[in-house]
């Protein structure tokens, strides 16, 4: 059961007009380095920890955690649309193992996943369907949210389960870091958006295009200092990366949701995916990190980071 890890930020703006060539070139080079790491490891299975942006999970029933025994990409922001090669047997066995370990997780036999799941797969493999996958959703947007410690417990339990597999497994965490994009909330969403985030009302092509244009404009305004969105926090991002690099995951148990929002923004809670991924790897002992990339990227409305890791022994 050899394990490896790759955590990375995601952004719909990687596939949209707006970001400078200099920024995209730097991120492309960093992703290429991570891709080489993944190619050398040559995983037989990929376990993803990722959020959703009201494309597959909605307030009508919002689990804190969910594992997919079948899944499909919704194709948002130019990402892959269609079924993913989910290993249903392993996903079911993982869920049973989690329940037995005291971590409650929901199951979806028809999980819809968006760019938060699909973009890292496409960037790391060139094709979202290149490897069998077990997708695990972590609610990181729809408040109220559970404590960060529960994401660490989830990851540790998944890591314990992975020890039973005779496969090379890549653990992927997707999201963050400091990050406050324009996401509708129960308190602020206009009627059409409220219907979508609660009931999952489908978007028309015109609505999808309008949302895409709104994201492009929001990023432009943010990058030019003309936005009410919370500023990026590179110091906070680097302190978090240092915790991951040094394996001090238990330090994060004291990070309250209020603290995370105040330091990193409303969508900084996507760091839960990194916490779970690193906890899964740490369940097998000490690890060492590589591919130390970080760039505060206002054009992406994100502190964009990449880390890889392998067990120390």
Swiss-Prot record:
Top-rank lineage group of the source organism: Bacteria
Regions annotated as coiled coil: none
Classification via InterPro entries: DHPP/DHXA_dioxygenase (IPR023789), Xdiol_dOase_suB (IPR004183)
Pfam families: LigB
Sample GO molecular function, one term: ferrous iron binding
Catalytic residues in the record: 115, 179
EC number: 1.13.11.16
Gene Ontology biological process terms in this record: 3-phenylpropionate catabolic process
Record's keyword terms, sorted: Aromatic hydrocarbons catabolism, Dioxygenase, Iron, Oxidoreductase
Similarity section: Belongs to the LigB/MhpB extradiol dioxygenase family.
Subunit structure: Homotetramer.
Protein name: 2,3-dihydroxyphenylpropionate/2,3-dihydroxicinnamic acid 1,2-dioxygenase
Gene: mhpB
